[in-house]
């Protein structure tokens, strides 16, 4: 991983936006679970971010490191948090600060079942060696949002790390592409706020076809630009979720849905109004992984204001510590 300290200037409020994204992942997941917390969705993303942090620590000390391997070892430590033991035959990495922070925590609310299924293996999955080549669910999205918090690297690096993080549990190339796009969407939001919404539409346009429109809308799709398509599919995504047509929960469909809902929610200038509009769009029983990602995207634009109404949580000390460690190493703050 190549890093530059001067090529990529950080926004003045970068620290607040990073903290907002961390808070939002926990808040969005808890909101979707009717306030059950902590849960697998946000804790796995935090562990994977700590794995990336460990790789950065090694690099800071002049030692070559493999980001994907460090994230896998972190994921194994998360597996132990959930199941009280490591997968049979898998490496047993030494604990880090986050393991101590979560020691004694209650049973976690469930998330994407594919994560535990894939990690229950002695071998590390990768893009070139997928263990579940058909796995394509929304569980890759929140970790991709956290990867976007890495500053001062080029977009190709952001997308690659997010893809590698997704490949640890999900083998489908479509899921890998969605993870890379998700990270770039959040990165754009962190860097340019609402000025990046047209870029979001372009990044996720590939996945719009996963929720097909009715015949009339399909007939005009070829002539629509990315922004118009995003708005059109927003209505289709909501209208299509009927009893005889379940919503598509592939990573790409979840990403497209989240980006569209956040884009529309930002029409409200007040952060709380935008937040409420987002969850109204997500529905009464939203997919937890999609809701968590959507809330992180909102916070990437609005910073901590996006979740300023959030009540105190038992996960807050971990979020505080992660924010402090991350900013100290990546931004010198």
Regions found by a protein language model. Give the residues of each.
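Structured, active/binding-site neighborhoods that engage oxygen-rich ligands
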Residues: 1-333
């Amino acid at each position: 991983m190549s890093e530059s300290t001067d090529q990529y200037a950080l926004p003045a409020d970068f620290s607040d936006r990073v903290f907002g994204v961390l808070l939002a992942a926990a808040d969005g997941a808890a909101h979707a679970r009717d306030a059950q917390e902590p849960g697998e969705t946000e804790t796995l993303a935090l562990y994977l971010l700590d794995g990336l942090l460990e790789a950065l620590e090694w690099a800071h000390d002049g030692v070559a490191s493999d980001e994907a391997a460090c994230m896998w070892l972190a994921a194994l430590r998360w597996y132990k948090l959930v199941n009280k033991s490591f997968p049979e035959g898998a490496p047993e990495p030494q604990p880090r600060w986050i393991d101590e922070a979560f020691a004694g925590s209650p049973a976690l609310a469930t998330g994407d079942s594919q994560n535990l299924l894939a990690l229950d293996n002695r071998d590390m999955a990768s893009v070139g060696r997928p263990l579940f080549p058909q796995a394509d669910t929304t569980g890759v999205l929140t970790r991709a949002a956290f990867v976007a918090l890495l500053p001062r690297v080029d977009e190709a690096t952001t997308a690659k790390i997010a893809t590698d993080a997704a490949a640890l549990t999900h083998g489908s190339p479509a899921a890998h592409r969605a993870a890379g796009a998700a990270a770039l969407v959040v990165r754009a939001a962190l860097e340019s706020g609402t000025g990046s919404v047209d870029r979001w539409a372009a990044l996720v346009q590939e996945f719009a076809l996963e929720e097909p429109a009715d015949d009339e809308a399909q007939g005009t799709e070829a002539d629509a630009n990315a922004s118009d398509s995003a708005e059109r599919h927003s209505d289709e995504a909501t209208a299509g979720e009927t009893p005889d047509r379940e919503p598509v929960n592939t990573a790409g469909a979840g990403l497209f849905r989240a980006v569209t809902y956040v884009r529309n929610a930002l029409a409200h200038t007040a952060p709380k109004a935008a937040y409420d509009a987002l969850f109204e769009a997500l529905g009464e029983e939203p997919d937890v992984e999609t809701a968590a990602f959507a809330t992180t995207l909102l916070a990437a634009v609005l910073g901590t204001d996006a979740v300023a109404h959030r009540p105190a949580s038992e996960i807050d000390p971990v979020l505080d510590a992660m924010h402090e460690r991350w900013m100290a190493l990546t931004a010198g703050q």
